[in-house]
Regions:
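DNA polymerase sliding clamps and clamp-related checkpoint/processivity subunits
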Residues: 1-100, 121-169, 173-232
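Aromatic- and glycine-enriched pocket-lining scaffold segments that form the walls
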Residues: 108-122
């Protein structure tokens, strides 16, 4: 679930509210209508029986809406337990891990990214049983928050969508409950359910020591594998 707010108090938004209220509109129709409007100013007016007029310059559309009271409420998440992350860094974590998530729904637990928070570190792990990717970063959180440990599995598709939505925001806040996670970036609220179950212990798949260590130029390695993949 995604919730986006447009603050009326910000002068650049140039929003005028004549009457407070709410309406639920068909997402596809509303999105296509807004894309086709030529003028920058849009007026939305809700009439009887939830009929909604959308006008801009000489264009006018009327679509049927639904009572906002029938729309499901967003889950209430305790905002006192907040983990703050640099947006650019967290997007890197997503990029480096979701590539290893499974696309097979037969093992739904592997379609997510296992995120654990312990001792001021966030560890993100993903595997489809053939590939494994892990990223560890330091996190900023209140002292009381650092004493708590978290172990959650977030759907990979949700993280991909989140990465697309948050762009220019400097930081992103993460709040975790028993079965939900909320990401907040300025005026965007992104809710996702958590996958239920136990993630495989991937620590056993990463050797603690090795007898051989190879250091390679990253660019040269990528070029070589790219050429070799032509015949795979």
């Amino acid at each position: 679930s995604i919730e986006t707010l447009i603050p009326v108090s910000e002068e650049n938004n140039q929003i005028e509210i004549h009457t407070q209220g709410g309406i639920v509109l068909p997402a596809r129709f509303f999105s296509e209508i807004v894309k086709k409007l030529a003028d920058e100013k849009i007026t939305i007016e809700v009439k009887d029986h939830f009929q909604t007029n959308i006008t801009s310059a000489k264009a006018s559309f009327t679509i049927n809406g639904i009572d906002v009271n029938n729309y499901p409420n967003f889950p209430v998440i305790d905002s006192n337990e907040v983990i703050t992350l640099p947006t650019a860094l967290f997007k890197q974590v997503i990029q480096h891990t979701v590539i290893a998530t499974s696309t097979q729904e037969s093992r739904p637990i592997l379609t997510g990214v296992n995120m654990t928070i312990k001792d001021g570190k966030l560890t993100a792990v993903a595997t489809d049983s053939h590939r494994l990717s892990q990223r560890i970063i330091s996190i900023a959180a209140p002292e009381s928050q650092l004493e708590k440990n978290y172990n959650v599995i977030i759907p990979g598709k949700s993280l991909v969508e989140l990465s697309r939505i948050v762009e220019n925001q400097p930081t992103i806040e993460m709040m975790i409950t028993e079965n939900q996670v909320l990401f907040k970036a300025e005026n965007v609220y992104f809710y996702s359910r958590l996958l239920e179950g136990y993630y495989p212990d991937t620590n056993r798949l990463i050797p603690a020591s090795s007898s051989t260590q190879i250091v390679l130029n990253a660019y040269d390695l990528l070029q070589a594998t790219d050429r070799a993949s032509l015949l795979s």
